[in-house]
A protein has these predicted regions:
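Karyopherin-beta/Importin-beta family HEAT-repeat alpha-solenoid scaffold
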Residues: 1-683
Length: 683
C-alpha cells in the first residue's frame, strides 16, 4: 500500500490494466458486484454528506469549525470505489462507438421483473436533493444499474451544493475529477445510445436512458449543472477542468444528446461565459479551452429546431469574430503585436479557432468553413508578424493542420480550391520568414523543428482530399492536392537532413508523407528537380539502413512505388538519373536482403521492391549474382548458391509486375532465405 501511495501520476493511467481487469471480473459476477459497490458507495456518500452538514451548521452559527477526522481516508475510499465502478459499468473506448457491456445489459434484464421504472425514476430524481443513500425509501424496486449511477449523482450533487455554499475548499479535487470521469464514461455508453450500434437494451435501461426518455433528459440537465458548478470553482485545477470539459463534450458529441442539451438554460450560460471571457472560464488551460469551444460549437450546430439555436450559435461565433477583428485589423497592429496583452489575446483566439475546427462534421461543415476561411487567410499575416515568436507561430500552423484535417474530405471543389490557396499562401510566407533559419548549428531540441513536423502533417492531410473526398462535385476546375503537396515538399526537402531524421516524431511523419506521395504521385516525384529528387532518394536510403522496422517498411514501399512506375511508364526511354537510381537501390536491397542481418517482418515490402528492381534491370542483377558467386572460396557453397539463385529467379522468369508474379517471387525469396541465408549473412 505504501508503494502505491508513493506513486505520482493519474491513478486511471497508472493502474489502467488492473482496473480494466477488476471491471471485467465484476461484470462476470454482476449480481454480487453491483449491490456490493452500491452499498459501499452509499455508505461513503452518507458519511461525506454528514460531515459537510456539520461544517455548514458550524459556519452558519458562527461557531469554530470543528476538526473533522478521517476526511483524507474517506476521499481515498470514494476515489477508488468510483474508479472500480466506472470500469465495471462501461469500457473506456478510443476511436470506436462506446457500448453498454453486454454483461451489464443482461444483469439489468434479469432484474426486470422486480424493477419498477417509476420507482427507479423517482429514486434517480431524488439524487438532486441529497442524502439519498441515507434515506428510508424502498429501493428494492429500483434497477440496480441505475441505483449505482444514482449514488454517483448524489455525490456530484453534494459537491454542487458545497460549491454553492462556499464550502468547496473542504472537497477533494481528485474525487471531483473522478466523479466527472465516471459520469462521462456513463454518458457516452448509456445516454441516448444509438440502437443501430448497441446490443438490445433491457426494458428498464431503455425506458430510463433511451432516446427521448424523461430520465435521459433529466440526466443531461443534471450533468450540465455539474459542469457549470465545476467550471465556476475548479477552472484553475487543470486535471479536473479537463475532465469536466470532456464531460461537457460527451453531452453534445451526438446529435440526439446535443438536441436535448441546447434546451437547457445552463448551456446558454456556458456559451455566454465563453463569449464574454469573464470569470473562471478565462483561467482554463489552453487545451481545455480548445475542447470547451469545440463542445459549445457542437451544441450550437445540432440539428434541433430550438428557437434559440441560431441566435446562440451566431452570437457565440460572432463574439470570436469580433474579438479577432478588433485585435488583428487595427491599423497599428504590427507595431502593437509584440505587447503581451495583444499577444495573449491572439494566442487565446487561435486556441478558440482550433476548437472550432475540431467541431467540424458533415452537418455543419459549410457554415464553419464560411466562418473559418477568412480567419485562415488572416492567420497567414499573423505568421508573418509573429515568425520570431514560436509560441504564436506554432499555433498558426496547428490551426491550419486542424482545419485542413477537419474540412478536406467534406468540401466542394470550389471550397477546396479556396482552402488550398490559403495553404499555398501559408507555405510561401513560411518560406520567406524561415529562409536560412534552419541549420545544424541551431539544432538543440526537437521542439525547434516542430514547425516542420506540422507542415508535414498539413501536407499529408491535403493529400487525403485526392484519396477520399466526400464533398459534392460542383464542376469547378480542380487545384490538385498533389501539386500543393509537392510544392510543400519543395520547401521541406532542403531542410531535411540525416541529423534531423534522428528525431523519432519528425522521422516517422516524414517517411509517412514520402511514402504517401510516392504511392499516389510517383510521376510527380520522378519529375522533381535534380537537387530535390536526390535529396529525397538519400533520405529513402537512410530509412533503409538506420531506422526501425516501421521506417524501413515505409522506405521499401516508397522505393517499390517509384520503381514500379519506372518499369511501367519510363523503361522505353529512361532518364539517366532513373537508371542510376535503379542500379543504386538494386545493389542496396540486394545486400540488405541477402548479405546483411535482415528482419523477416520486412519480407513482404522488401520482396515487392526487390522484384520491381530486378525486372527493371535484370542485367545488373545478374552482375551482382556473379560477383557474389565469384567471391565464394568454397566450391560447395558456390554451387549451392547457384542453385538457390536459379530457383529465386529462374531463366524463364516473366518480367512482369502483375499480382501473380509478385506472389511467386515472394515465395521464391522466402525459400531462398530459408535455404542459404545462414551462411550468406555477414554479421
Amino acid at each position: 500500500m505504501e508503494e502505491i501511495c508513493d506513486l505520482e501520476g493519474d491513478d486511471r493511467e497508472l493502474f489502467s490494466d488492473q482496473l480494466c481487469s477488476i471491471g471485467e471480473f465484476a461484470r462476470i459476477s454482476a449480481a454480487h458486484a453491483f449491490p456490493l459497490l452500491t452499498a459501499l458507495l452509499e455508505n461513503r456518500v452518507c458519511k461525506l454528506e454528514e460531515r459537510l452538514t456539520a461544517l455548514q451548521t458550524a459556519a452558519n452559527s458562527g461557531s469554530p469549525i470543528p476538526p473533522i477526522q478521517g476526511m483524507e481516508n474517506l476521499f481515498e475510499d470514494l476515489h477508488w470505489l468510483l474508479l472500480i465502478a466506472g470500469h465495471m459499468i462501461a469500457d473506456e473506448s478510443t476511436g470506436e462507438t462506446p457500448l453498454i457491456p453486454s454483461a451489464v445489459v443482461q444483469y439489468s434484464a434479469a432484474c426486470v421483473e422486480r424493477t419498477d421504472v417509476t420507482a427507479t425514476l423517482d429514486f434517480m430524481f431524488g439524487s438532486q436533493s441529497g442524502a439519498l443513500g441515507c434515506s428510508s425509501m424502498d429501493k428494492s424496486r429500483v434497477d440496480p444499474v441505475v441505483k449505482l449511477v444514482t449514488c454517483v449523482c448524489c455525490l456530484a450533487s453534494a459537491g454542487n451544493k458545497a460549491i454553492a455554499s462556499n464550502m468547496a475548499h473542504f472537497l477533494s479535487p481528485q474525487v471531483a475529477g473522478t466523479v466527472v470521469w465516471f459520469l462521462r464514461n456513463f454518458t457516452r455508453s448509456y445516454l441516448f445510445p444509438d440502437e443501430r450500434d448497441s446490443v438490445e437494451l433491457s426494458a428498464s435501461l431503455s425506458s430510463i436512458f433511451g432516446k427521448d426518455s424523461t430520465g435521459g433528459k433529466w440526466m443531461i440537465g443534471f450533468l450540465l449543472d455539474t459542469v457549470r458548478a465545476n467550471l465556476t470553482y475548479w477552472a484553475s485545477e487543470p486535471a479536473l477542468a479537463e475532465d469536466t470539459v470532456l464531460l461537457l463534450l460527451s453531452l453534445v458529441d451526438t446529435k440526439s444528446r446535443a438536441e436535448v442539451a441546447v434546451s437547457f438554460e445552463c448551456l446558454w450560460q456556458l456559451g455566454q461565459l465563453q463569449a464574454s471571457r469573464e470569470g473562471p472560464i478565462s483561467q482554463l488551460p489552453a487545451e481545455v479551452h480548445r475542447f470547451y469551444v469545440q463542445a459549445l460549437v457542437l451544441a450550437g450546430s445540432s440539428e434541433g429546431d430550438h428557437p434559440l439555436r441560431d441566435r446562440y450559435w451566431k452570437q457565440f461565433l460572432q463574439s470570436m469574430h469580433n474579438r479577432f477583428g478588433i485585435v488583428c485589423h487595427q491599423p497599428n497592429f504590427v507595431k502593437l503585436a509584440q505587447k503581451e496583452p495583444i499577444k495573449a489575446e491572439v494566442q487565446s483566439l487561435l486556441e478558440s479557432f482550433k476548437g472550432v475546427a475540431l467541431a467540424v462534421n458533415a452537418w455543419n461543415v459549410n457554415e464553419l468553413f464560411d466562418f473559418l476561411l477568412p480567419v485562415l487567410r488572416d492567420s497567414v499575416t499573423l505568421l508573418s508578424v509573429y515568425h520570431t515568436c514560436p509560441e504564436v507561430a506554432v499555433l498558426v500552423l496547428e490551426f491550419y493542420v486542424n482545419a485542413v484535417e477537419a474540412f478536406v474530405n467534406f468540401l466542394s471543389q470550389t471550397q477546396a480550391n479556396h482552402l488550398f490557396k490559403a495553404c499555398l499562401s501559408l507555405l510561401d510566407t513560411y518560406t520567406k520568414c524561415n529562409m536560412g533559419k534552419h541549420s545544424l548549428s541551431s539544432l538543440v531540441e526537437e521542439e525547434q523543428f516542430y514547425d516542420l513536423l506540422l507542415l508535414m502533417k498539413l501536407l499529408s492531410h491535403m493529400l487525403a482530399q485526392d484519396i477520399l473526398n466526400l464533398g459534392p462535385d460542383d464542376g469547378t476546375e480542380k487545384i490538385s492536392a498533389g501539386d500543393v503537396t509537392l510544392y510543400g515538399l519543395n520547401i521541406i526537402l532542403p531542410l531535411i537532413t540525416v541529423e534531423l531524421l534522428k528525431f523519432p516524431s519528425l522521422c516517422e511523419e516524414y517517411f509517412k508523407l514520402s511514402t504517401f506521395v510516392c504511392e499516389v504521385y510517383p510521376e510527380k516525384v520522378v519529375a522533381l528537380p535534380d537537387g530535390l529528387f536526390h535529396n529525397m532518394m538519400s533520405t529513402l536510403e537512410v530509412g533503409l539502413s538506420i531506422y526501425d522496422s516501421d521506417i524501413s517498411k515505409m522506405s521499401l514501399e516508397s522505393v517499390a512505388s517509384l520503381i514500379e512506375h519506372f518499369f511501367k511508364e519510363m523503361r522505353e526511354n529512361p532518364p539517366q538519373r532513373m537508371l542510376e537510381i535503379v542500379r543504386h537501390f538494386l545493389r542496396l536491397i540486394f545486400n540488405m536482403v541477402l548479405l546483411e542481418s535482415f528482419d523477416m517482418d520486412l519480407l513482404q515490402p522488401a520482396s515487392c521492391a526487390f522484384h520491381a528492381l530486378i525486372c527493371s534491370n535484370q542485367g545488373y542483377y545478374t552482375e551482382l549474382v556473379r560477383s557474389l558467386l565469384a567471391h565464394q572460396g568454397d566450391p560447395v557453397i558456390s554451387q549451392r548458391l547457384l542453385g538457390a539463385f536459379h530457383q529465386l529467379t529462374p531463366s524463364d522468369m516473366k518480367l512482369s509486375l502483375d499480382k501473380h508474379s509478385k506472389a511467386q517471387f515472394r515465395r521464391n525469396l522466402d525459400t531462398f532465405l530459408a535455404n542459404v541465408k545462414g551462411f550468406l549473412c555477414r554479421k
